[in-house]
Amino acid sequence: MATPHIAANPGDFADTVLMPGDPLRAKHIAETYLANPVLVNDVRGMLGYTGEYRGRMLSVMGSGMGVPSISIYAHELFTQFNVKNIVRIGSCGSIRDEVKVRDIVIGMGAGTDSLVNRVRLNHYDFAAIADYDLLEPVVNAARRREARFHVGALFTTDLFYAADPGLTERLSAHGVKAVEMEAAGLYGVAAECGGKALALCTVSDHLLSGERLSPEERRTSFNDMVEIALEAAVGF
């Protein structure tokens, strides 16, 4: 049954959905990696596809940018379309010297400056963590590919243009690997809805050195992350 944001029918989505932020990246992933991809959503240009990968039905759909956007789509996928697993595949900005541009950060947990999870729990803190059943297969897939990856904490921010110049230093001192804009919200929705979620992000920008990928480099560098997610998802 269609929702306000997803015009799909029951059964249109697979158990596992990969979610890049950019709907055009979802289209690229579906057309590049999935056999017989079918467009299952295009409301507001948020493209979603379902197809086959190595004998397993998988879906890929854009999430948009930020906690509110991914929260809407994740909630509807979990509660209305019987999706079991959502894997965010996106970009992040490194705040650690050892986490280089093009490296992959697998978000075991995510802090945030957003209040969404506190609102869920009457303003108490919430431990926004990934599901281990997704985390372990992704780590194993990254190891098999001999990818450069790091497992640890992300920081999810509502502000792309940071208002607190000292925050990066404080986060880094607490071991946070990178900054992005969705993971903590996704983990909160998954917990609320009884689903499983994981975020893995390719470092597109280094917030300490200023190094960043060009648009073309982003496209090619992100392929490693996508292929790791696909390989792992077959075994979920």
From Swiss-Prot:
GO terms for biological process: purine nucleoside catabolic process. A purine D-ribonucleoside binds at H5, E180, M181, E182, S204, D205. GO terms for molecular function: purine-nucleoside phosphorylase activity. PROSITE patterns: PNP_UDP_1. SUPFAM superfamilies: Purine and uridine phosphorylases. Keywords: Glycosyltransferase, Transferase. Disulfide bonds: none annotated. Phosphate binds at G21, R25, R44, R88, I89, G90, S91. It holds the Pfam family PNP_UDP_1. It comes from the Bacteria. It catalyses: a purine D-ribonucleoside + phosphate = a purine nucleobase + alpha-D-ribose 1-phosphate; a purine 2'-deoxy-D-ribonucleoside + phosphate = a purine nucleobase + 2-deoxy-alpha-D-ribose 1-phosphate. GO terms for cellular component: cytosol. Belongs to the PNP/UDP phosphorylase family. Catalyzes the reversible phosphorolytic breakdown of the N-glycosidic bond in the beta-(deoxy)ribonucleoside molecules, with the formation of the corresponding free purine bases and pentose-1-phosphate. This is Purine nucleoside phosphorylase DeoD-type. It comes from Hahella chejuensis (strain KCTC 2396).
